[in-house]
């Protein structure tokens, strides 16, 4: 597997709330490691044209509220300078719906990665995909890094969920390109049809053997050298993918989960219940979502 150049431009989608602080820190860490330009994008809700004192355009200057675009831009610059005054950054603030604003800004800047945070349910004390993140992973033609963990250090471990398809092969290649120093674990979950009517142990062994052979072929087709492939941990497990991955994430070292989307996949509104989407929502740590290669060609 040939290591390509790092992306030269990434974007961070932020709502300026504390929920996005972890995504902010991760974006800075990645931008420094890749020596990439970082564009911070924030979408503002449209302002009301009428105030208690009349229409904004008709008010004297001292009665007009501060320019919200300039205020948001100044806040972002202050935060970035406080974190690292030397990083190459751009700030894009625009009025509009968040997902379209982010996607269009990413397209215009030729970004190769979108970094974003997640919403939080304070009552249930769990992190979950918000509407904006959900729309980003449906419509983006570039990978989206969903950040839940604190960004203490670079990713050391990477878990690639695979069904041995072209989509998951591209996801693996993307993960290796982005984070070449991370160790790789390959994860495949399978179900045994008619398990109650068959000799379960024997059938499961057959599926295990198939999974190991398929994993070897998968890594070879991804362009991974034999010596590198031997260093990849294989997990061929029986069960529901998102349940197994969530359990593994909660009981193992911190890692980045990498998942590819299929054809229509989670891009298709009708397939929101797909395995990929369930994995993204279930895994408690960071997730790199790599769009289906056919979608990139179409765009």
Where are the regions that the model predicts?
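Structural beta-alpha unit
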Residues: 1-6, 19, 26, 45-48, ...
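Small/aliphatic-rich secondary-structure junction motif
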Residues: 2-60, 157-205, 224-227, 231
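General small-molecule cofactor/ligand-binding pocket signal
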Residues: 39-41, 90-94, 145, 185-187, ...
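Short, well-ordered secondary-structure micro-motifs
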Residues: 50-52, 127-128, 171, 196-200, ...
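A short acidic, glycine-rich active-site loop
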Residues: 59-72, 203-214
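Glycine-rich, Arg-bearing micro-motifs that act as flexible, cationic patches
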Residues: 113-135, 154-155, 256-282, 296-297
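Short beta-strand elements of ligand-binding domains
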Residues: 115-118, 144-149, 287-291
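Short, structured interface segments
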Residues: 131-150
């Amino acid at each position: 597997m040939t290591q390509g150049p790092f992306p030269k431009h990434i974007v961070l989608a932020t709502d300026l709330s504390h929920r996005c602080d972890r995504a902010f820190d991760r974006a800075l860490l990645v931008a420094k490691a890749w020596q990439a330009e970082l564009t911070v994008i924030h979408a503002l809700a449209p302002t009301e044209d009428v105030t208690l004192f009349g229409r904004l355009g008709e008010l004297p200057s001292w009665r007009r509220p501060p320019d919200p675009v300039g205020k948001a831009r100044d806040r972002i610059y202050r935060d970035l300078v406080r974190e690292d005054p030397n990083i190459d950054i751009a700030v894009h603030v625009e009025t509009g719906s968040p997902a379209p604003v982010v996607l269009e800004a990413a397209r215009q800047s030729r970004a190769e990665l979108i970094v974003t945070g997640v919403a939080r349910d304070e009552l249930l004390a769990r992190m979950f995909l918000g509407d904006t993140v959900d729309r980003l992973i449906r419509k983006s033609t570039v990978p989206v890094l969903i950040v839940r963990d604190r960004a203490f250090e670079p990713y050391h471990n990477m878990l690639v969920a695979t069904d041995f398809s072209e989509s998951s092969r591209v996801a693996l290649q993307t993960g290796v390109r982005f984070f070449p120093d991370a160790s790789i674990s390959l994860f495949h979950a399978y179900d045994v049809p008619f398990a109650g009517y068959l000799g379960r142990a024997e059938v499961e062994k057959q599926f295990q053997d198939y999974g190991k052979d398929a994993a070897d072929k998968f890594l070879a087709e991804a362009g991974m050298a034999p010596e590198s492939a031997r260093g990849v941990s294989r997990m061929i497990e029986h069960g529901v993918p998102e349940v197994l991955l969530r359990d593994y994430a909660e009981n193992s070292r911190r890692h980045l989960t990498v998942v590819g989307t299929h054809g229509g996949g989670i891009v298709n509104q009708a397939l929101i219940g797909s395995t990929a989407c369930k994995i993204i929502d279930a895994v408690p740590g960071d997730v790199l979502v790599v769009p289906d290669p056919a979608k990139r060609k179409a765009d």
